[in-house]
Amino acid sequence: MKPGIHPEYRPVVFHDTSVDEYFVVGSTLQTDRTIEWKDGKTYPYFTLDVSSESHPFYTGKQRVVQAEGRIANFNRRFGQFSKDKD
């Protein structure tokens, strides 16, 4: 490999904020934030909204709250058109 053109590969702590889970994965991600991990070492830190710990495909759980909001919004906007007219 050509020296000096590849990003640094290092362990990074990822934090899934939706379920408050932390995990360390090797990555080339660049971040200025750091966190001290359980082993006493300091690692780069990156927050995630969704990961395999919280995504419905991997957990088998559906997030009904968001879907209910969309259905209610649709019914509020277009519900009057579906009423039976005598």
Swiss-Prot record:
<dbReference type="Pfam" id="PF01197">
    <property type="entry name" value="Ribosomal_L31"/>
</dbReference>
<dbReference type="GO" id="GO:1990904">
    <property type="term" value="C:ribonucleoprotein complex"/>
</dbReference>
<dbReference type="GO" id="GO:0005840">
    <property type="term" value="C:ribosome"/>
</dbReference>
<comment type="subunit">
    <text>Part of the 50S ribosomal subunit.</text>
</comment>
<keyword id="KW-0687">Ribonucleoprotein</keyword>
<dbReference type="GO" id="GO:0003735">
    <property type="term" value="F:structural constituent of ribosome"/>
</dbReference>
<dbReference type="InterPro" id="IPR042105">
    <property type="entry name" value="Ribosomal_bL31_sf"/>
</dbReference>
<dbReference type="GO" id="GO:0006412">
    <property type="term" value="P:translation"/>
</dbReference>
<protein>
    <recommendedName>
        <fullName>Large ribosomal subunit protein bL31B</fullName>
    </recommendedName>
</protein>
<dbReference type="InterPro" id="IPR002150">
    <property type="entry name" value="Ribosomal_bL31"/>
</dbReference>
<dbReference type="InterPro" id="IPR027493">
    <property type="entry name" value="Ribosomal_bL31_B"/>
</dbReference>
<comment type="similarity">
    <text>Belongs to the bacterial ribosomal protein bL31 family. Type B subfamily.</text>
</comment>
<dbReference type="InterPro" id="IPR034704">
    <property type="entry name" value="Ribosomal_bL28/bL31-like_sf"/>
</dbReference>
<keyword id="KW-0689">Ribosomal protein</keyword>
